[in-house]
Amino acid sequence: SLEYYIDRNFKFETLILELCPPDKKGRVRELYIHSGTLMGVKPGDLFMVYEEVPIGGVMTRQKVGRLRVNDVENPDVARCKVTKGDAEIAGAFGAGRGLICVSDGKAFGF
């Protein structure tokens, strides 16, 4: 179907800009990504978070978490709730390891 084709072929990637301060239990619940209204991002949109990991000399991606957009701050920045993988995302980001956020077409109405 057309919806399946769009979901599979028109994803976009972005980066995590900054983590919000942790909650009272030390968990990072929100963060900022480098995509906003300019890319059509709106509240409720979903992103999968992957860590780039070398395996046998080849860069691969391993899923570490999921985000839901809470608020679009401006054309270039959105604030997201971490819905899965808060410890993994915080650890990788803090260590400077490569994290990539990939749009999840299911949330974009496709």
Regions found by a protein language model. Name each.
Residues S1-F110:
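Surface-exposed, polar/charged interaction patches used for macromolecular assembly or partner binding
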